[in-house]
Amino acid sequence: LLLFISPILLDDWKHRSMLAVKPIRQWKYLLQKISSYWLVNMALVILALFVVFLVQSLSFGWDNLTTPFLVFRGEEEALMFPLQFIGIVLLFAACVFLFLINLVAWCNQLSRNKMVGFIAGVMVIWAEPIFRSMKIYPSFADKLPLYYVNFGSVIQGMKDDFYTTGTFTISNGCASLLVGAFVFFLLTVGTSFWQERHRRGGLV
């Protein structure tokens, strides 16, 4: 759903006149647009998690929220409270959404074709499981945000052989995704400035 509607909501080609009525710098305009869309997506995620845990609590009792459950961190077993797990999921989802939204925003600046952003997002989402199935494990994989987009594997699949090195962690993932999002934001702003200068040069 995110990939289908992102190119539409983040499309600036048809709305450049908004900058005339709202005289702010281009990078501030893009930042506000990306931030507002990110907040909407996070609100939907929080609502979905709330409904899931509400149904679960009504079915199995409210004590279920305070009862720790078993998780794996590498080869080690540990106990984690449900609310702690929800916090980790929300933090990681926030980073993943921020990365994907900035990626799609950059694709929108590069091409008017909205399918470009959709295809780029799909490729990033499926890159990690495809590489894993092909036994492609670069030494720097834990530094690449695309290996963390499939965050279910990171949060739940720590005992998988792909994570036995212990370098694929939540903290590394959040840092990698935030850096990746910042890089794509800079690329989006830079591409926008270049296109605007090129357009003005063409008019002259």
Give the residues covered by each predicted segment.
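Conserved glycine-rich helix-kink/hinge and helix-boundary motifs of the Major Facilitator Superfamily
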Residues: 30-34, 119-122
